[in-house]
């Protein structure tokens, strides 16, 4: 927020709804995953995996929409106005994943430890589904 107003970005509040929704959703999915683990039904493992994929995709899409909105809906009254070669207002959207040069800055966006743990947990759940399916056939 300190520098964003110079290029016309909106103020980013600390109380966006996602900061309340995401922790609850993650907590529910953890509890649901533990319950499914104790039940040991391989079909439920797959259902949990698919639900996590859907929720993860929805979360990334929501984050992309926030980035797009804040990076493209700029105030025309900003102290600094930057234009693209075609005369349109230059956007300042950071990357969802990867690196991107924005003027003389390079913005980076890569997963951290929590994302790696989430990925490992999802892969273990998928592996448990295949093991459970194989055991049921035998």
Sequence positions of predicted segments:
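Long, glycine/tryptophan/cysteine-rich extracytoplasmic
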Residues: 1-18, 64-109
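Membrane-helix exit/interface motif
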Residues: 7-13, 32-39
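Hydrophobic alpha-helical transmembrane segments
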Residues: 17-37, 46-57, 116-122
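Mature, soluble, non-transmembrane domains
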Residues: 37-76, 98-100
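A hydrophobic membrane-anchoring alpha-helix module
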Residues: 108-135
């Amino acid at each position: 927020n300190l520098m964003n107003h110079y290029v016309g970005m909106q103020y980013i509040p600390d109380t966006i709804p996602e900061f309340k929704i995401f922790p609850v959703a993650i907590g529910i999915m953890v509890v649901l995953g533990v319950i499914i683990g104790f039940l040991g039904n391989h079909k439920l493992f797959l259902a949990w995996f698919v639900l996590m994929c859907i929720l993860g995709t929805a979360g990334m899409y929501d984050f992309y929409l926030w980035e797009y909105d804040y990076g493209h809906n700029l105030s025309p009254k900003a102290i600094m106005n930057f234009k693209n070669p075609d005369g349109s207002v230059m956007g300042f959207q950071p990357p969802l994943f990867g690196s991107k040069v924005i003027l003389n800055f390079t913005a980076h966006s890569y997963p951290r430890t929590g994302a790696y743990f989430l990925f490992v947990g999802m892969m273990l759940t998928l592996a448990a589904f295949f093991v459970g399916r194989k055991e049921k056939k035998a």
